[in-house]
Amino acid sequence: MAAAAAGAGSGPWAAQEKQFPPALLSFFIYNPRFGPREGQEENKILFYHPNEVEKNEKIRNVGLCEAIVQFTRTFSPSKPAKSLHTQKNRQFFNEPEENFWMVMVVRNPIIEKQSKDGKPVIEYQEEELLDKVYSSVLRQCYSMYKLFNGTFLKAMEDGGVKLLKERLEKFFHRYLQTLHLQSCDLLDIFGGISFFPLDKMTYLKIQSFINRMEESLNIVKYTAFLYNDQLIWSGLEQDDMRILYKYLTTSLFPRHIEPELAGRDSPIRAEMPGNLQHYGRFLTGPLNLNDPDAKCRFPKIFVNTDDTYEELHLIVYKTELRPSSYTQSEASISASVHPTLDFCRRLDSIVGPQLTVLASDICEQFNINKRMSGSEKEPQFKFIYFNHMNLAEKSTVHMRKTPSVSLTSVHPDLMKILGDINSDFTRVDEDEEIIVKAMSDYWVVGKKSDRRELYVILNQKNANLIEVNEEVKKLCATQFNNIFFLD
Amino acid sequence: MHPGGGPSRAERLELGLGRERPAKAIFLHRRPGEGGGRERCLRCGHVCVRRGPGPREAVPSGRPRPDTLTPPWVRQRAVTGTFCASWTPLRNRRAQRMATDMQRKRSSECLDGTLTPSDGQSMERAESPTPGMAQGMEPGAGQEGAMFVHARSYEDLTESEDGAASGDSHKEGTRGPPPLPTDMRQISQDFSELSTQLTGVARDLQEEMLPGSSEDWLEPPGAVGRPATEPPREGTTEGDEEDATEAWRLHQKHVFVLSEAGKPVYSRYGSEEALSSTMGVMVALVSFLEADKNAIRSIHADGYKVVFVRRSPLVLVAVARTRQSAQELAQELLYIYYQILSLLTGAQLSHIFQQKQNYDLRRLLSGSERITDNLLQLMARDPSFLMGAARCLPLAAAVRDTVSASLQQARARSLVFSILLARNQLVALVRRKDQFLHPIDLHLLFNLISSSSSFREGEAWTPVCLPKFNAAGFFHAHISYLEPDTDLCLLLVSTDREDFFAVSDCRRRFQERLRKRGAHLALREALRTPYYSVAQVGIPDLRHFLYKSKSSGLFTSPEIEAPYTSEEEQERLLGLYQYLHSRAHNASRPLKTIYYTGPNENLLAWVTGAFELYMCYSPLGTKASAVSAIHKLMRWIRKEEDRLFILTPLTY
């Protein structure tokens, strides 16, 4: 029960019971076609983490996955296994490209108890991990790889197995360290995008700003506009935006927040040429535009890999309204040709000042929104909303996102109940509603309607079913008044 | 009052659930009486393997009766008593040992005070129960204690077993499969080769253990007992084969049983032979993970699950497209496992495989597939299994008391349980003092009876193991229908294989008493309406419900009516109950209340310490009406409880 396993049992009650959260045991990528004959099994393995594992052990583990997949094809040739549950761990399988398999093995959470004779007894908690959550995490691993490296097949075409292995090694070596498996939850399943609600006028202003910019900077292919980690406008395809959003909000932005908070008086903007005072700067690319030797290195990204397969450069430019505030707007721009320092200067001069103005407009909106929602007292409920059609997601359960953990304000068990309800919803297409009362007496409500899902956790332990229903109705009326939910 | 109240587990009464169980193939069902033309072999279409006269002949009257009562190879042992010294005492002392077991059972029962339902059910019983209601107070709670060992459904099925399983896997480490090939493909290849070889050279256990007598054994014809249904890999043209394979794949639920050596024991669809390589892979997966001191549980894919249950020396696998959780599927597999134990006893099963690891168990079980098939079918339709409880035939309390009393008086020295049932519903159950039946055992008995119509033909006397009671030995069950044209079936469970006549006499006395008191007419009348309609409750939107009293181990539910008239609809409704049940009883995140609104109906589940209630309403009903319906329904059940439940179970 005790929330998230204080660092492997150094807590006050470590004497009786230690808890260990789920952990990544191994992660590997293989292609069965690459080592079809006996004695060549090692060739199948394209990436294996942890790399220190002995060769035969790797081959054995890959062999098990192949066997599981092959075995399930007996029963459904086109839909082989997605996951394997064992007493100690769970393995998740994903075949993102034909014959390329990605496997993630996660150890079940453990409770270590002291038996009467003083020996530690290990108990695996087999029902704690939610399949859908970790399958989504695994799929995300591929999407993220693909965003920065393109498809496996492309690497094979460009430089054969050797190049593919290099790319996989380079990417996953670091990326796997950023997986925080103990704090994965429903939001990982949705992989949604938080949108910033905006009035029409401001929205149009932003759109025309983007149009003008794309016109004057013709190497710009796509633009996305975010404010405070929330998306306002995107020219990218939904799936590409979804993973880019994930990267920006959980990796790139947080990395830049911390240094800023630390050294507010950084000299970046000190010698601004001209009188256009603004606080824009590049999050990717040159740190200092006035340094002629500044390196213009932008990460490459790959979008539309299913058809046009575009290779682009990711430029992220950010401005802050006031240097001390958190409010910020970011434009993420994708360019087709490699941007030069000169281009960066032009972009800075065009985008910087305008973005600052826009940011102030948006900030006004932001404050209005805040006043409206803040006028009520602390609500008795928390909710998560997701719309499958536009990927819009909204959560009052999660307090903040950091690069490492997403903090939730509710008990992990309740989050798992949400996950259970979500997986029940997936099994049928029809609209459904489920209201449950947990052992802790919290009420949890799940509604699915027209490809939208809403989950509510109510903190009124003594409420009855009818009151809970009323409460949720009220919530729907205030937050989602234009969405029909099954009553 | 309740937990820890009584000095002993007063509530553990055995009950007779009338659940259909298929007749076990390997047992000879035959009337023991030798004279007066009664001597007839009640064959149920199973293969009866035995020594001496061919299976289809009548038994010569001079034949020692015990031979007819035990599975063939057991009988062998008794006949050739000197052959296997270690076994002989085992058989001879069976009765004694059973008595000791009961003794032991009794004392162990006392230790577990927590499950004890209160002895003092005399306390006031609330009209409309609340969640805080204590066990023993809820509607349907027995007045004088329960009849069953307490089963808390799923949890009960697993707890002790897991210990056993880990012990087994430990053993596996030392003497199990030889060094692991590095590649799984290799393993599965090896296994398919192995199984081909084995079918070639298979020698029966009996043959080996009883040299010289092997020519007396009839090789059980492979497919007797049930038609070979759609073998997946047979077919004349390729197209046919494709179709057949596709049809085979699409079955809702496959069940496979195999031995640790990968030998097929049972397959629900398709012949075991055709599937031997698939089964080889299954067992390879199991042992592969065990080599890592791990255990395979399940595989999940879009639209189906594969669930593994390991009960040494067997491996059971289900492939299901139903909505059931892996937990529930594992529970069903355990039922299959117990079903096999009930035919063989656990002791014999492990003995066989100790003697010969790659023994082909189908030799012993052939003919029993029908019982297993029937069990699987029953589990898909009958909520008794889900509830882990028995349903009673609705009967006026006075009539039931008369029946129970008559049953109680018709006792014999060796009787442990007397059970009267009608179409898988319990009418009355009398047990020996301090002996309790487990609902699983009762379900297995019900399945045995319902899977064979041959029991209607006279008195049957068959050995049966009640695995939850004691997996080491056989009881002997006397099974007979009271009157040929009714569904009333009497089941008398005895410890003594020799006691047929005494037990048969109990039946006669019971019937006499019933007639004398006129209860047989009332019973007959009651059998005309074996189910009640939900309309009697008087809640317009209510379509169906299940209510279980935890302390008595009994549940009640009305007939399933429109719109659930077709078989598919009925299974869908049960599927919804299963879904709610699995969420409510989730091992790590149990729930107290669930209200589910779907496109076709609304359902509510409410689980408390004392009872479980599942209701199904019209989709038009509101939550407010549902809440008020709960109270109305609970009051109705309280009012009707003496008709719907057995409140005063008796002991001899």
UniProtKB/Swiss-Prot annotation, chain B:
Disordered as annotated region, ranges: 102-141, 158-185, 211-245
PANTHER family, sorted: SAND PROTEIN-RELATED (PTHR13027), VACUOLAR FUSION PROTEIN MON1 HOMOLOG A (PTHR13027:SF14)
Name of this chain's protein: Vacuolar fusion protein MON1 homolog A
Pfam families recorded: Fuz_longin_1 (PF19036), Fuz_longin_2 (PF19037), Fuz_longin_3 (PF19038)
Record-listed Phosphoserine modification sites: S128, S153, S188
Repressor among keywords: no
GO biological process: protein secretion; protein targeting to vacuole; vesicle-mediated transport
Subunit structure of this chain's protein: Interacts with CCZ1. Found in a complex with RMC1, CCZ1, MON1A and MON1B. The MON1A-CCZ1B complex interacts with RIMOC1. The MON1A-CCZ1B complex interacts with RAB7A and this interaction is enhanced in the presence of RIMOC1.
InterPro entries: FUZ/MON1/HPS1_longin_1, FUZ/MON1/HPS1_longin_2, FUZ/MON1/HPS1_longin_3, Mon1
Modified residues (Phosphothreonine): T158
Superkingdom to which the source organism belongs: Eukaryota
Family: Belongs to the MON1/SAND family.
Role, per record: Plays an important role in membrane trafficking through the secretory apparatus. Not involved in endocytic trafficking to lysosomes. Acts in concert with CCZ1, as a guanine exchange factor (GEF) for RAB7, promotes the exchange of GDP to GTP, converting it from an inactive GDP-bound form into an active GTP-bound form.
Any one Gene Ontology molecular-function term assigned to this protein's record: guanyl-nucleotide exchange factor activity
GO cellular component: cytosol; Mon1-Ccz1 complex
Keywords: Guanine-nucleotide releasing factor, Phosphoprotein
